[in-house]
Amino acid sequence: MDLIDSHAHVDVSDFDADREAMLGRAQAAGVGTLLAIGNGPEIEKLGAAVPYAERYEWIYAAAGIHPHEARHATEAHYAELDRLARLPKLIAWGEIGLDYHYDHSPRDVQASVFHHQLDQARAAKRPVIIHCREAWPDCLRILDEAWRSSGLGGIFHCFTGTEGEALSGIDMGFLVSFAGNVTYPKAQNLRDVAGLLPLDKLLIETDSPFLAPQPHRGRRNEPAYVTEVARTIGNVRNLPAEEIAGVTAENFRRLFGISHSRTRSGAVPEEHHLTSDREGNL
């Protein structure tokens, strides 16, 4: 299968004992491209995904301040993110957004940090990866006010909302990504949404090491298991998993302006996400 795992945390300590083997299993399963996510709260951890993108041709990186960590954000964090955005394989800003389920950071602080990073991502011409949990009205409002006009779009990562919320995001240029929780027996609502949305607006991910799909539930998740997400969505839509894999891979490439050969070779994305001025400073 031609698979892209659009969201994985491969830098975390869960993989320290077998990271090389884990990445090998991903490739053996057909994962030709992986987007590795770096988040704080420590400044040096914002770029935690970058070394993997620089080492492995098939891995790209993203960086951002997670809403859980918004209370830790400082000007130094923002400056580090601006620096990271100049790196050629840092192709997305995130994950960023709002989380009202845990409220690890005050909601007004989450909103402020979210706004700030949207401004930075717009300046850097990077699509954004959105984390939204139980905060859809505020999240969609902020994106409508501060992001829609950028034309850069992004990803609703690990989507858990309604069809209407997904369509609102799609209207603003977002793709909707489903993770391992779409496979859970009690997640029929998510499967319904995955079956109703336009196929050219879907992505799949693992959110590794979290949310292992049903066959592996209760254990550590890893990128190879993105096949289970493709299979589940394929079952919902009466399509082979291979077709879900191929279409979602093309959706990812289209968002980031990269060709099939470039996702396999790890080349730098097309010019429309890297301005000539910024390329001169890479």
Residue spans for each PLM region:
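Mid-domain alpha/beta scaffold segments of enzyme catalytic cores
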Residues: 1-282
